[in-house]
């Protein structure tokens, strides 16, 4: 039995977890502790990197202790240490990776620097024991990507956003409409009380052959509609959110369909290919419902993590570390590995350019 301690500090969650794979090959989460910084950043309407880094410094030791206690383990009983080394906010990455290095060096245990995006990419194998290959739709505050996942460390990016990430569009829409931080969940909550047919927002890139995404025009349409209605009533806000969210789901359905078709052609012998949706936006019920309908029509199975594993967490980091350890992909010179604020999952792909491809977590 291999037990890996995972540490995640790439943005505004301080997290630690212990994950294992038993003799029966079944993975298990022994603990998963996440301390959010929502209160620290709420007054600013978004994450302030300096505040986030300081909060990680103050909280990380206690979070690690809590994860070990929940797993009923001591540090000596952990077999390896995995930590997010990028992409993300540099201050937070330094805190988590430096702590992991200190623990690994003191105990003489392997250190596994993990790409945060790989954590999301492999979560479905932790929760559903999914076999390779599969298609990944990664939707979060920093990313909107479609990735072909052929194995551990074997990723090919098929599509990405040409401007804003989807989670970023949710957050900016929330801020525009005066909704509190975090934006995504509050837009979804308001949308539940709104009329999605009131505003006919655009479906960016609809019908285009390329599979990429675009969300900046949708965000601009919301701003224009809100400006024409100002001052906004509570129902106006709800209707704007509902119409925005509906346009998002229609955009996803149109864009993702192209990659599903390509995947089916490249893997014709798979009886029921899988689409994995991961990242914070994967917690949105409307997004999940739309993708379920799309997969049903295309002969795919939708695999979505439990809600507590959609956002940033350390269980996915520990699991990615365990997968790399078992695949013989240990990082040479890990103790000297520098945090990487920009670290693409598919390092062979062309660099991302443009306002929404600025790479904070690309």
From Swiss-Prot:
This is tRNA N6-adenosine threonylcarbamoyltransferase. Gene3D superfamilies: 3.30.420.40. Coiled coil: none annotated. Its EC number is 2.3.1.234. It is found in: Cytoplasm. Its cofactor is Fe(2+). Required for the formation of a threonylcarbamoyl group on adenosine at position 37 (t(6)A37) in tRNAs that read codons beginning with adenine. Is involved in the transfer of the threonylcarbamoyl moiety of threonylcarbamoyl-AMP (TC-AMP) to the N6 group of A37, together with TsaE and TsaB. TsaD likely plays a direct catalytic role in this reaction. One of its GO terms (biological process) is tRNA threonylcarbamoyladenosine modification. It catalyses: L-threonylcarbamoyladenylate + adenosine(37) in tRNA = N(6)-L-threonylcarbamoyladenosine(37) in tRNA + AMP + H(+). SUPFAM superfamilies: Actin-like ATPase domain. The gene is tsaD. It comes from Chelativorans sp. (strain BNC1). Keywords: Acyltransferase, Cytoplasm, Iron, Metal-binding, Transferase, tRNA processing. GO terms for molecular function: iron ion binding; N(6)-L-threonylcarbamoyladenine synthase activity. Fe cation binds at residues 116, 120, 312. InterPro entries: ATPase_NBD (IPR043129), Gcp-like_dom (IPR000905), KAE1/TsaD (IPR017861), Peptidase_M22_CS (IPR017860), TsaD (IPR022450). One of its GO terms (cellular component) is cytoplasm. It is an enzyme of class 2 (transferase).
């Amino acid at each position: 039995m291999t037990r890996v301690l995972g540490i995640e500090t790439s943005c505004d969650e301080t997290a630690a977890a212990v994950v294992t794979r038993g003799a029966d090959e079944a993975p298990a989460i022994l603990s998963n502790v996440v301390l959010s910084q929502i209160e620290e950043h709420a007054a600013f309407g978004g994450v302030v990197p300096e505040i986030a880094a300081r909060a990680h410094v103050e909280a990380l030791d206690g979070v690690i202790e809590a994860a070990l206690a929940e797993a009923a383990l001591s540090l000596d009983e952990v077999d390896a240490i995995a930590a997010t080394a990028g992409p993300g906010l540099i201050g937070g990455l330094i805190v988590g990776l430096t702590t992991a290095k200190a623990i690994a060096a003191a105990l003489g245990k392997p250190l596994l620097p993990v790409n945060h995006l790989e954590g999301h990419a492999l979560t479905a194998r932790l929760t559903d024991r999914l076999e390779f290959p599969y298609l990944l739709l990664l939707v979060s505050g920093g990313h909107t990507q479609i990735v072909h996942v052929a194995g551990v460390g074997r990723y090919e990016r098929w599509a990405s956003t040409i401007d804003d990430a989807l989670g970023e569009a949710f957050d900016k829409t929330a801020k525009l409409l005066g909704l509190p931080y975090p934006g995504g969940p509050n837009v979804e909550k308001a949308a539940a009380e709104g009329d999605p047919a009131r505003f006919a927002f655009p479906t960016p890139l609809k019908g285009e052959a390329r599979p990429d995404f675009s969300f900046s025009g949708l965000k601009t349409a919301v701003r224009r509609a809100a400006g024409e209605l100002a001052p906004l009533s509570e129902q106006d806000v709800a209707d704007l959110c509902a119409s925005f969210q509906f346009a998002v789901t229609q955009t996803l359905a149109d864009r993702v369909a192209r990659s599903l078709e390509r995947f089916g052609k490249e893997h014709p012998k798979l009886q029921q290919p899988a689409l994995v949706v991961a990242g914070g936006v994967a917690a949105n019920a409307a997004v999940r419902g739309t993708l379920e309908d799309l997969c049903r029509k295309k002969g795919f199975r939708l695999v979505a993590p439990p809600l507590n594993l959609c956002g940033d967490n350390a269980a996915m980091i520990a699991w990615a570390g365990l997968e790399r350890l078992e695949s013989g992909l240990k990082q040479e010179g890990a103790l000297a590995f520098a945090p990487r604020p920009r670290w693409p999952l598919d390092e062979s792909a062309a660099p991302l350019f443009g306002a929404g491809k600025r790479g904070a977590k690309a």
